[in-house]
Protein backbone atom coordinates (compact mmCIF):
# COMPACT_ATOMS: atom_id res chain seq x y z
CA UNK A 1 0.00 0.00 0.00
CA UNK A 2 1.22 3.50 -0.89
CA UNK A 3 0.70 6.15 1.82
CA UNK A 4 0.56 9.82 0.80
CA UNK A 5 2.65 12.40 2.64
CA UNK A 6 1.10 15.81 3.33
CA UNK A 7 3.87 18.09 4.58
CA UNK A 8 2.87 21.04 6.74
CA UNK A 9 6.35 22.28 7.68
CA UNK A 10 5.64 25.63 6.01
CA UNK A 11 2.33 26.13 7.84
CA UNK A 12 2.04 24.22 11.13
CA UNK A 13 5.82 23.97 11.36
CA UNK A 14 6.28 27.70 10.92
CA UNK A 15 3.87 28.23 13.81
CA UNK A 16 6.66 27.02 16.11
CA UNK A 17 7.20 29.85 18.63
CA UNK A 18 9.94 32.21 17.45
CA UNK A 19 9.98 31.01 13.83
CA UNK A 20 9.25 33.32 10.90
CA UNK A 21 10.28 32.57 7.33
CA UNK A 22 10.84 35.01 4.48
CA UNK A 23 9.16 34.26 1.12
CA UNK A 24 12.52 33.10 -0.27
CA UNK A 25 13.04 30.83 2.75
CA UNK A 26 9.66 29.25 2.07
CA UNK A 27 10.55 28.71 -1.57
CA UNK A 28 13.88 27.08 -0.72
CA UNK A 29 12.24 24.65 1.70
CA UNK A 30 9.38 23.91 -0.72
CA UNK A 31 11.82 23.01 -3.49
CA UNK A 32 13.65 20.61 -1.17
CA UNK A 33 10.37 19.04 -0.03
CA UNK A 34 9.44 18.54 -3.67
CA UNK A 35 12.79 16.88 -4.37
CA UNK A 36 12.20 14.72 -1.29
CA UNK A 37 8.99 13.44 -2.84
CA UNK A 38 6.14 14.71 -0.65
CA UNK A 39 2.69 14.51 -2.23
CA UNK A 40 1.28 17.76 -0.81
CA UNK A 41 3.03 20.90 0.41
CA UNK A 42 0.91 23.05 2.71
CA UNK A 43 2.69 26.27 1.80
CA UNK A 44 1.08 28.41 4.47
CA UNK A 45 -2.14 30.21 5.33
CA UNK A 46 -2.78 32.77 2.58
CA UNK A 47 -4.98 34.99 4.74
CA UNK A 48 -2.17 35.54 7.28
CA UNK A 49 -0.32 38.43 5.63
CA UNK A 50 0.90 40.00 2.42
CA UNK A 51 4.31 38.40 2.95
CA UNK A 52 2.70 34.99 3.46
CA UNK A 53 0.84 35.33 0.16
CA UNK A 54 4.05 36.42 -1.55
CA UNK A 55 5.78 33.27 -0.30
CA UNK A 56 2.95 31.00 -1.42
CA UNK A 57 2.88 32.68 -4.85
CA UNK A 58 6.61 32.08 -5.29
CA UNK A 59 6.00 28.40 -4.62
CA UNK A 60 3.00 28.04 -6.94
CA UNK A 61 4.92 29.74 -9.76
CA UNK A 62 7.82 27.29 -9.40
CA UNK A 63 6.01 24.48 -11.19
CA UNK A 64 6.72 21.83 -8.57
CA UNK A 65 5.44 18.27 -8.83
CA UNK A 66 3.75 18.36 -5.42
CA UNK A 67 0.19 19.59 -4.89
CA UNK A 68 0.42 23.09 -3.36
CA UNK A 69 -2.09 23.75 -0.60
CA UNK A 70 -3.17 26.67 1.60
CA UNK A 71 -4.71 26.38 5.05
CA UNK A 72 -8.11 28.12 5.22
CA UNK A 73 -10.90 28.56 7.70
CA UNK A 74 -14.48 28.01 6.56
CA UNK A 75 -14.66 31.61 5.38
CA UNK A 76 -14.95 32.98 1.82
CA UNK A 77 -12.30 35.62 2.58
CA UNK A 78 -9.76 32.89 3.44
CA UNK A 79 -10.61 30.95 0.29
CA UNK A 80 -10.32 34.11 -1.82
CA UNK A 81 -6.82 34.71 -0.43
CA UNK A 82 -5.87 31.15 -1.36
CA UNK A 83 -7.28 31.62 -4.87
CA UNK A 84 -5.19 34.77 -5.25
CA UNK A 85 -2.10 32.61 -4.68
CA UNK A 86 -3.15 30.12 -7.38
CA UNK A 87 -2.86 27.07 -5.10
CA UNK A 88 -4.06 23.63 -6.15
CA UNK A 89 -5.95 22.87 -2.97
CA UNK A 90 -7.18 24.15 0.37
CA UNK A 91 -6.95 22.49 3.77
CA UNK A 92 -10.34 23.66 5.02
CA UNK A 93 -10.39 23.37 8.80
CA UNK A 94 -13.56 23.32 10.90
CA UNK A 95 -13.58 23.02 14.73
CA UNK A 96 -15.76 20.06 15.73
CA UNK A 97 -15.26 19.42 19.46
CA UNK A 98 -17.84 20.64 21.99
CA UNK A 99 -15.26 22.85 23.71
CA UNK A 100 -14.24 24.51 20.43
CA UNK A 101 -17.79 24.97 19.17
CA UNK A 102 -19.05 26.36 22.48
CA UNK A 103 -16.19 28.64 23.51
CA UNK A 104 -14.35 29.51 20.29
CA UNK A 105 -17.10 29.57 17.68
CA UNK A 106 -20.16 29.96 19.91
CA UNK A 107 -22.08 27.83 17.42
CA UNK A 108 -24.15 24.66 17.51
CA UNK A 109 -23.30 21.48 15.59
CA UNK A 110 -25.89 22.34 12.94
CA UNK A 111 -24.46 25.83 12.48
CA UNK A 112 -20.91 24.49 12.20
CA UNK A 113 -22.05 21.90 9.66
CA UNK A 114 -23.85 24.54 7.57
CA UNK A 115 -20.82 26.86 7.61
CA UNK A 116 -18.46 24.05 6.63
CA UNK A 117 -20.60 22.84 3.72
CA UNK A 118 -21.06 26.34 2.32
CA UNK A 119 -17.28 26.84 2.44
CA UNK A 120 -16.64 23.53 0.67
CA UNK A 121 -19.16 24.46 -2.03
CA UNK A 122 -17.56 27.87 -2.48
CA UNK A 123 -14.06 26.39 -2.84
CA UNK A 124 -15.25 23.73 -5.30
CA UNK A 125 -17.09 26.33 -7.40
CA UNK A 126 -13.71 28.02 -7.85
CA UNK A 127 -11.95 24.84 -8.97
CA UNK A 128 -10.01 23.94 -5.81
CA UNK A 129 -9.23 20.50 -4.42
CA UNK A 130 -10.71 20.47 -0.90
CA UNK A 131 -9.48 18.56 2.13
CA UNK A 132 -12.16 18.99 4.79
CA UNK A 133 -10.46 18.82 8.17
CA UNK A 134 -12.04 18.38 11.61
CA UNK A 135 -10.10 20.38 14.19
CA UNK A 136 -9.86 18.76 17.64
CA UNK A 137 -11.52 15.70 16.12
CA UNK A 138 -10.17 13.39 18.82
CA UNK A 139 -12.25 15.23 21.44
CA UNK A 140 -15.31 15.30 19.17
CA UNK A 141 -18.38 13.07 18.86
CA UNK A 142 -17.35 10.48 16.28
CA UNK A 143 -20.88 10.35 14.87
CA UNK A 144 -20.74 14.09 14.19
CA UNK A 145 -17.40 13.61 12.41
CA UNK A 146 -18.88 10.91 10.19
CA UNK A 147 -21.91 13.11 9.42
CA UNK A 148 -19.68 16.10 8.59
CA UNK A 149 -17.45 14.06 6.29
CA UNK A 150 -20.34 12.37 4.47
CA UNK A 151 -22.20 15.64 3.99
CA UNK A 152 -18.93 17.17 2.83
CA UNK A 153 -18.62 14.49 0.17
CA UNK A 154 -22.08 15.40 -1.16
CA UNK A 155 -20.99 19.00 -1.83
CA UNK A 156 -17.68 18.02 -3.43
CA UNK A 157 -15.01 17.52 -0.75
CA UNK A 158 -12.15 15.43 -2.16
CA UNK A 159 -10.72 14.03 1.06
CA UNK A 160 -11.12 14.49 4.82
CA UNK A 161 -8.77 14.78 7.78
CA UNK A 162 -8.99 13.81 11.44
CA UNK A 163 -6.90 16.15 13.60
CA UNK A 164 -5.53 15.18 17.01
CA UNK A 165 -5.11 18.88 17.72
CA UNK A 166 -3.94 18.62 21.33
CA UNK A 167 -2.22 15.24 21.06
CA UNK A 168 -4.53 13.22 23.30
CA UNK A 169 -4.74 10.07 21.17
CA UNK A 170 -3.07 6.82 22.11
CA UNK A 171 -1.95 4.28 19.49
CA UNK A 172 -4.77 1.90 20.45
CA UNK A 173 -7.46 4.59 20.31
CA UNK A 174 -6.03 5.94 17.07
CA UNK A 175 -6.39 2.64 15.24
CA UNK A 176 -9.92 2.13 16.60
CA UNK A 177 -11.03 5.67 15.69
CA UNK A 178 -9.70 5.56 12.14
CA UNK A 179 -11.12 2.09 11.60
CA UNK A 180 -14.59 3.33 12.53
CA UNK A 181 -14.32 6.46 10.39
CA UNK A 182 -12.91 4.74 7.30
CA UNK A 183 -15.61 2.05 7.52
CA UNK A 184 -18.31 4.75 7.46
CA UNK A 185 -16.80 7.37 5.14
CA UNK A 186 -16.11 6.89 1.43
CA UNK A 187 -13.55 9.68 0.99
CA UNK A 188 -9.79 9.19 1.55
CA UNK A 189 -8.96 9.92 5.20
CA UNK A 190 -5.89 11.84 6.42
CA UNK A 191 -4.36 11.88 9.90
CA UNK A 192 -2.91 14.97 11.59
CA UNK A 193 -1.25 14.36 14.98
CA UNK A 194 0.37 16.62 17.54
CA UNK A 195 3.05 15.48 19.97
CA UNK A 196 1.87 16.78 23.35
CA UNK A 197 2.37 13.36 24.96
CA UNK A 198 5.23 12.30 22.71
CA UNK A 199 3.11 9.87 20.71
CA UNK A 200 2.51 11.71 17.41
CA UNK A 201 4.55 9.27 15.31
CA UNK A 202 3.02 6.19 16.97
CA UNK A 203 -0.51 7.60 16.65
CA UNK A 204 0.05 8.43 12.99
CA UNK A 205 1.27 4.92 12.19
CA UNK A 206 -1.66 3.43 14.10
CA UNK A 207 -4.05 5.61 12.10
CA UNK A 208 -2.62 4.09 8.91
CA UNK A 209 -3.24 0.63 10.36
CA UNK A 210 -6.82 1.80 10.94
CA UNK A 211 -7.25 2.88 7.32
CA UNK A 212 -5.82 6.39 6.95
CA UNK A 213 -4.15 6.85 3.56
CA UNK A 214 -2.45 10.22 4.03
CA UNK A 215 -0.23 11.47 6.88
CA UNK A 216 0.23 15.11 7.87
CA UNK A 217 3.83 15.61 9.04
CA UNK A 218 6.55 18.22 9.53
CA UNK A 219 10.30 18.00 9.03
CA UNK A 220 12.05 17.41 12.38
CA UNK A 221 8.62 17.18 14.05
CA UNK A 222 8.46 20.96 14.50
CA UNK A 223 5.20 22.74 15.25
CA UNK A 224 3.19 24.46 17.93
CA UNK A 225 3.79 23.44 21.54
CA UNK A 226 5.47 20.00 21.48
CA UNK A 227 5.34 19.81 17.69
CA UNK A 228 3.78 17.55 15.08
CA UNK A 229 4.34 14.04 13.80
CA UNK A 230 7.86 13.92 12.38
CA UNK A 231 8.15 13.33 8.62
CA UNK A 232 11.36 11.35 8.91
CA UNK A 233 10.10 9.19 11.79
CA UNK A 234 6.72 8.45 10.20
CA UNK A 235 8.18 7.61 6.78
CA UNK A 236 10.93 5.39 8.23
CA UNK A 237 8.58 3.62 10.64
CA UNK A 238 5.95 2.99 7.97
CA UNK A 239 8.58 1.55 5.64
CA UNK A 240 10.74 -0.46 8.05
CA UNK A 241 8.31 -1.49 10.77
CA UNK A 242 5.00 -1.76 8.91
CA UNK A 243 5.91 -2.35 5.27
CA UNK A 244 4.06 0.67 3.85
CA UNK A 245 5.59 2.60 0.96
CA UNK A 246 5.68 6.35 0.30
CA UNK A 247 7.15 8.42 -2.51
CA UNK A 248 9.78 9.84 -0.15
CA UNK A 249 13.42 9.53 -1.22
CA UNK A 250 14.64 8.46 2.20
CA UNK A 251 18.33 9.07 1.47
CA UNK A 252 17.52 12.81 1.37
CA UNK A 253 15.94 12.96 4.85
CA UNK A 254 19.08 14.14 6.69
CA UNK A 255 19.81 16.84 4.11
CA UNK A 256 16.27 18.25 4.23
CA UNK A 257 16.30 18.10 8.03
CA UNK A 258 19.39 20.29 8.17
CA UNK A 259 18.10 22.79 5.60
CA UNK A 260 14.90 23.30 7.61
CA UNK A 261 16.93 23.53 10.82
CA UNK A 262 19.18 26.21 9.33
CA UNK A 263 16.43 28.36 7.82
CA UNK A 264 14.17 28.12 10.88
CA UNK A 265 17.08 28.49 13.30
CA UNK A 266 15.89 25.42 15.23
CA UNK A 267 18.76 23.05 16.13
CA UNK A 268 18.03 19.36 15.67
CA UNK A 269 18.38 17.58 19.05
CA UNK A 270 21.36 15.17 18.92
CA UNK A 271 19.16 12.27 20.06
CA UNK A 272 16.45 12.97 17.46
CA UNK A 273 15.38 9.69 15.86
CA UNK A 274 16.53 9.09 12.27
CA UNK A 275 18.21 12.47 11.63
CA UNK A 276 19.87 13.35 14.96
CA UNK A 277 23.66 13.36 15.05
CA UNK A 278 23.54 10.71 17.77
CA UNK A 279 20.94 8.54 16.00
CA UNK A 280 23.77 6.31 14.74
CA UNK A 281 26.47 7.26 17.28
CA UNK A 282 28.13 4.65 19.49
CA UNK A 283 30.45 4.97 22.50
CA UNK A 284 30.10 1.93 24.78
CA UNK A 285 32.83 -0.61 24.11
CA UNK A 286 30.42 -3.57 23.99
CA UNK A 287 28.26 -1.79 21.43
CA UNK A 288 31.15 -0.80 19.19
CA UNK A 289 32.60 -4.30 19.36
CA UNK A 290 29.28 -5.73 18.20
CA UNK A 291 28.97 -3.03 15.55
CA UNK A 292 32.38 -3.86 14.08
CA UNK A 293 31.35 -7.50 13.75
CA UNK A 294 27.89 -6.76 12.33
CA UNK A 295 26.27 -3.32 12.17
CA UNK A 296 22.82 -4.85 12.67
CA UNK A 297 23.74 -5.73 16.27
CA UNK A 298 23.13 -2.13 17.38
CA UNK A 299 21.54 -0.39 14.39
CA UNK A 300 17.98 -1.08 13.19
CA UNK A 301 18.72 0.40 9.76
CA UNK A 302 21.81 1.54 7.89
CA UNK A 303 22.40 5.28 8.43
CA UNK A 304 23.00 5.78 4.70
CA UNK A 305 19.39 4.75 4.07
CA UNK A 306 18.24 8.07 5.57
CA UNK A 307 21.25 10.14 4.54
CA UNK A 308 22.80 10.04 8.01
CA UNK A 309 26.16 8.52 8.99
CA UNK A 310 27.64 6.28 11.64
CA UNK A 311 29.73 7.98 14.33
CA UNK A 312 32.10 6.39 16.84
CA UNK A 313 32.31 8.55 19.95
CA UNK A 314 35.26 8.28 22.31
CA UNK A 315 34.90 8.70 26.05
CA UNK A 316 35.26 6.87 29.34
CA UNK A 317 32.93 4.09 28.13
CA UNK A 318 35.02 3.34 25.05
CA UNK A 319 37.13 0.22 24.62
CA UNK A 320 40.38 -0.35 22.72
CA UNK A 321 38.54 -1.84 19.76
CA UNK A 322 36.43 1.29 19.46
CA UNK A 323 39.55 3.44 19.58
CA UNK A 324 41.31 1.32 16.96
CA UNK A 325 38.21 1.40 14.75
CA UNK A 326 38.00 5.19 15.06
CA UNK A 327 41.68 5.65 14.22
CA UNK A 328 41.30 3.36 11.20
CA UNK A 329 38.35 5.44 9.99
CA UNK A 330 40.54 8.55 10.28
CA UNK A 331 43.37 6.86 8.37
CA UNK A 332 45.74 6.85 11.36
CA UNK A 333 48.09 3.88 11.88
CA UNK A 334 49.69 3.35 15.29
CA UNK A 335 51.58 0.54 17.01
CA UNK A 336 50.03 -1.53 19.80
CA UNK A 337 52.14 0.34 22.36
CA UNK A 338 51.03 3.70 21.00
CA UNK A 339 47.42 2.51 20.93
CA UNK A 340 47.61 1.66 24.64
CA UNK A 341 49.03 5.10 25.48
CA UNK A 342 46.36 6.86 23.42
CA UNK A 343 43.72 4.70 25.10
CA UNK A 344 44.89 5.73 28.57
CA UNK A 345 44.81 9.42 27.60
CA UNK A 346 41.28 9.00 26.22
CA UNK A 347 40.18 7.45 29.53
CA UNK A 348 41.78 10.33 31.46
CA UNK A 349 39.82 12.84 29.37
CA UNK A 350 36.60 10.90 29.95
CA UNK A 351 37.09 10.71 33.71
CA UNK A 352 37.44 14.50 33.75
CA UNK A 353 33.97 14.75 32.24
CA UNK A 354 35.28 15.80 28.85
CA UNK A 355 33.90 14.81 25.48
CA UNK A 356 36.70 13.94 23.07
CA UNK A 357 36.30 15.66 19.74
CA UNK A 358 38.10 14.63 16.56
CA UNK A 359 40.56 17.46 17.12
CA UNK A 360 41.19 16.30 20.70
CA UNK A 361 41.95 12.79 19.46
CA UNK A 362 44.36 14.11 16.85
CA UNK A 363 46.09 16.18 19.54
CA UNK A 364 46.50 13.04 21.68
CA UNK A 365 47.84 11.11 18.68
CA UNK A 366 50.34 13.88 17.96
CA UNK A 367 51.42 13.88 21.60
CA UNK A 368 51.92 10.10 21.71
CA UNK A 369 53.42 9.53 18.25
CA UNK A 370 55.19 12.83 17.69
CA UNK A 371 53.57 13.03 14.25
CA UNK A 372 52.05 16.33 13.19
CA UNK A 373 49.06 16.67 10.91
CA UNK A 374 50.13 18.67 7.88
CA UNK A 375 48.80 22.22 7.96
CA UNK A 376 47.80 22.57 4.32
CA UNK A 377 46.19 25.97 4.79
CA UNK A 378 47.73 28.47 7.19
CA UNK A 379 46.20 31.66 8.53
CA UNK A 380 48.66 34.51 7.94
CA UNK A 381 46.49 37.52 8.68
CA UNK A 382 43.07 38.25 10.16
CA UNK A 383 41.47 41.69 10.44
CA UNK A 384 37.99 42.32 11.81
CA UNK A 385 36.20 45.68 11.95
CA UNK A 386 33.02 46.05 13.98
CA UNK A 387 31.27 48.64 16.07
CA UNK A 388 28.17 50.76 16.55
CA UNK A 389 26.49 51.57 13.20
CA UNK A 390 29.19 49.63 11.34
CA UNK A 391 28.41 46.46 9.41
CA UNK A 392 30.93 43.89 10.69
CA UNK A 393 33.55 43.09 8.05
CA UNK A 394 36.55 40.76 8.13
CA UNK A 395 39.48 40.13 5.82
CA UNK A 396 41.80 37.12 5.85
CA UNK A 397 45.06 36.18 4.20
CA UNK A 398 45.68 32.44 3.94
CA UNK A 399 48.58 30.46 2.52
CA UNK A 400 47.63 27.29 0.66
CA UNK A 401 50.69 25.02 0.65
CA UNK A 402 49.12 22.56 -1.77
CA UNK A 403 49.60 24.98 -4.66
CA UNK A 404 51.82 27.52 -2.85
CA UNK A 405 49.34 30.33 -3.36
CA UNK A 406 48.01 33.14 -1.21
CA UNK A 407 44.25 33.40 -0.67
CA UNK A 408 42.85 36.81 0.28
CA UNK A 409 39.17 37.49 0.86
CA UNK A 410 36.81 39.91 2.60
CA UNK A 411 33.32 39.18 3.89
CA UNK A 412 30.51 40.76 5.88
CA UNK A 413 28.57 39.11 8.70
CA UNK A 414 25.84 39.67 11.26
CA UNK A 415 28.60 40.02 13.84
CA UNK A 416 32.40 39.98 13.97
CA UNK A 417 32.59 36.19 14.46
CA UNK A 418 30.23 35.55 11.56
CA UNK A 419 32.20 37.94 9.35
CA UNK A 420 35.52 36.27 10.20
CA UNK A 421 34.21 32.75 9.53
CA UNK A 422 32.54 33.90 6.30
CA UNK A 423 35.85 35.38 5.11
CA UNK A 424 37.71 32.11 5.76
CA UNK A 425 35.05 30.02 4.02
CA UNK A 426 35.00 32.40 1.07
CA UNK A 427 38.80 32.25 0.76
CA UNK A 428 38.93 28.45 0.60
CA UNK A 429 35.86 28.03 -1.64
CA UNK A 430 38.08 27.43 -4.66
CA UNK A 431 40.13 24.80 -2.82
CA UNK A 432 37.39 22.65 -1.25
CA UNK A 433 33.64 22.67 -0.66
CA UNK A 434 33.58 22.76 3.13
CA UNK A 435 30.38 23.70 4.95
CA UNK A 436 29.89 24.93 8.51
CA UNK A 437 27.35 22.50 10.00
CA UNK A 438 27.23 23.81 13.55
CA UNK A 439 28.71 26.57 15.69
CA UNK A 440 28.21 27.03 19.39
CA UNK A 441 29.81 28.52 22.48
CA UNK A 442 29.82 25.90 25.24
CA UNK A 443 31.71 27.25 28.22
CA UNK A 444 32.07 30.80 29.44
CA UNK A 445 33.76 31.56 32.74
CA UNK A 446 33.29 34.63 34.92
CA UNK A 447 34.74 38.04 34.16
CA UNK A 448 35.31 39.97 30.95
CA UNK A 449 38.64 38.22 30.29
CA UNK A 450 37.32 34.69 30.86
CA UNK A 451 38.21 31.80 28.58
CA UNK A 452 35.53 30.97 26.04
CA UNK A 453 35.18 27.50 24.51
CA UNK A 454 33.97 27.39 20.93
CA UNK A 455 32.77 24.23 19.17
CA UNK A 456 32.46 23.98 15.39
CA UNK A 457 31.36 21.15 13.13
CA UNK A 458 32.48 21.20 9.50
CA UNK A 459 31.44 18.95 6.64
CA UNK A 460 33.23 17.98 3.43
CA UNK A 461 31.11 15.57 1.44
CA UNK A 462 30.01 12.90 3.92
CA UNK A 463 32.88 13.56 6.34
CA UNK A 464 32.19 15.66 9.45
CA UNK A 465 34.75 16.83 11.99
CA UNK A 466 34.21 18.56 15.31
CA UNK A 467 36.77 20.93 16.81
CA UNK A 468 36.88 22.70 20.17
CA UNK A 469 39.04 25.73 20.87
CA UNK A 470 39.43 27.90 23.96
CA UNK A 471 40.61 31.49 24.06
CA UNK A 472 39.82 34.74 25.83
CA UNK A 473 39.11 36.14 22.34
CA UNK A 474 35.96 34.57 20.87
CA UNK A 475 36.90 35.64 17.33
CA UNK A 476 40.33 34.04 17.58
CA UNK A 477 38.91 30.86 19.13
CA UNK A 478 36.30 30.62 16.38
CA UNK A 479 38.72 31.14 13.49
CA UNK A 480 41.32 28.78 14.98
CA UNK A 481 38.66 26.08 15.35
CA UNK A 482 37.49 26.54 11.75
CA UNK A 483 41.07 26.50 10.43
CA UNK A 484 41.92 23.30 12.32
CA UNK A 485 38.75 21.65 11.07
CA UNK A 486 39.52 22.64 7.48
CA UNK A 487 43.01 21.14 7.71
CA UNK A 488 41.63 17.95 9.23
CA UNK A 489 39.20 17.56 6.33
CA UNK A 490 41.87 18.33 3.73
CA UNK A 491 44.10 15.65 5.27
Swiss-Prot record:
Pfam families: HCS_D2, HMGL-like, LeuA_dimer. Belongs to the alpha-IPM synthase/homocitrate synthase family. The keyword Nucleus does not apply. This is (R)-citramalate synthase CimA. Catalyzes the condensation of pyruvate and acetyl-coenzyme A to form (R)-citramalate. Residues 3-254 form the Pyruvate carboxyltransferase domain. Gene3D superfamilies: 1.10.238.260, 3.30.160.270, Aldolase class I. It comes from Methanocaldococcus jannaschii (strain ATCC 43067 / DSM 2661 / JAL-1 / JCM 10045 / NBRC 100440) (Methanococcus jannaschii). GO terms for molecular function: (R)-citramalate synthase activity; 2-isopropylmalate synthase activity. PANTHER family: (R)-CITRAMALATE SYNTHASE CIMA (PTHR42880:SF2), HOMOCITRATE SYNTHASE (PTHR42880). Homodimer. Keywords: Amino-acid biosynthesis, Branched-chain amino acid biosynthesis, Isoleucine biosynthesis, Transferase. The gene is cimA. GO terms for biological process: isoleucine biosynthetic process; L-leucine biosynthetic process. It is an enzyme of class 2 (transferase). It catalyses: pyruvate + acetyl-CoA + H2O = (3R)-citramalate + CoA + H(+). Coiled coil: none annotated.
Amino acid sequence: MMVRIFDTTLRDGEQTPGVSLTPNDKLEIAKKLDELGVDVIEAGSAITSKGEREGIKLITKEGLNAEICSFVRALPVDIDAALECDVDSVHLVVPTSPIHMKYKLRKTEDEVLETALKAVEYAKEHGLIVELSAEDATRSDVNFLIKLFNEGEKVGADRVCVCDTVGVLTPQKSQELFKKITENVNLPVSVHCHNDFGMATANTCSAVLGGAVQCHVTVNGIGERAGNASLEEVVAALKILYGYDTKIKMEKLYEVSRIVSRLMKLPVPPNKAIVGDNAFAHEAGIHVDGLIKNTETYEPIKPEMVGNRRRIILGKHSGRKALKYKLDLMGINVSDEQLNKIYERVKEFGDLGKYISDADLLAIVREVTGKLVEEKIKLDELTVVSGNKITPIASVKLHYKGEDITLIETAYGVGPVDAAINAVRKAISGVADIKLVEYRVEAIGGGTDALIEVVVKLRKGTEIVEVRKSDADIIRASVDAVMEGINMLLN
